[in-house]
Amino acid sequence: LKADLPENIVEDIAMAVVLMGETPEVKNWTVYLVNLKNEPLTNVLISSKGYGEKDGKQVKTSVLRHFIGDMEANSFAGVEAIDPEVFGLTNEYWLSYYIGSTIYDKKFIFLPESIIDSNLIKIPLVNKPGVMIK
């Protein structure tokens, strides 16, 4: 049955963990969805969770669901603030959205320790430093 479904490829969509600001004591990070398409997205839904090993124990964060709604072409939307304490975990964002009547979905996975200064780039549209998966 699943073989009968078309493979809807997600392109020109990115998830980014963006450095919003910093003081000597703390860095503030926010996760953004970036729509690099020239068309709008509707019914955008993202579930997020973290999992992995911390201090020798398996840990999981709560699964959070974020309804973004509709996004204009070439736009971005904040998903959630993210605590640097979870950068040592695998952070997974499962995105689903519609273009017209066609549904698309994709998992974006930030591996442990991938959100580091040496991986920062300028995130398109947001125009701030961050780590992006496309």
What are these model-predicted stretches?
Residues 54-90, 100-103:
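Intrinsically disordered, low-complexity Pro/Gly/Ser/Thr-rich segments with frequent PxxP/GP/PP motifs
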